[in-house]
């Protein structure tokens, strides 16, 4: 797991390039904000989290007590060996994500979560980028 990068992943770089090309300026992993979100766009008061489906268990949510499956994502598989370790790890990751989201919205930030599977094909990227740009344009008007 030491080879797994927590920042500057290919999906993050793809999203940052799209934002830059569309005129949005941002900060990366701003340490002044709890949880160090992947991308911070102060002008729109927006945070963008680019999450890997496997590590953040896309399709699973923390309901306060346990993980609950809410959707199916082919990339969010679970290893068959050492299940206790992986279940505990994924539970911690999803719980931490939920805590950060709650803190960010309480602080008045607008949040967009982009899942790795939403960047796989050109069609999915186009749909994801349209959603992101539409929201950023709307939030930019409010500031």
Where are the regions that the model predicts?
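Nucleic-acid endo/exonuclease domains
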Residues: 1-143
């Amino acid at each position: 797991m030491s080879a797994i990068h927590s920042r500057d992943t290919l999906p993050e770089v793809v999203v940052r390039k799209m934002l830059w090309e569309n005129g949005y300026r941002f900060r990366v992993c701003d340490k002044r904000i709890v949880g160090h979100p992947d991308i911070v766009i102060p002008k729109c008061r927006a945070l963008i989290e680019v999450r890997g489906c496997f590590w953040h268990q896309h399709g699973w949510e923390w309901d306060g007590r346990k993980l609950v499956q809410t959707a199916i994502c082919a990339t969010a598989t679970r290893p068959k060996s050492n299940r206790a370790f992986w279940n505990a790890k994924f539970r911690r990751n999803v719980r931490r994500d939920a805590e950060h989201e709650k803190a960010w919205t309480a602080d008045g930030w607008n949040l967009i979560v982009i899942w790795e599977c939403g960047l796989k094909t050109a069609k999915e990227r186009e749909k994801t980028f349209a959603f992101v740009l539409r929201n950023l344009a709307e939030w930019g008007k409010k500031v």
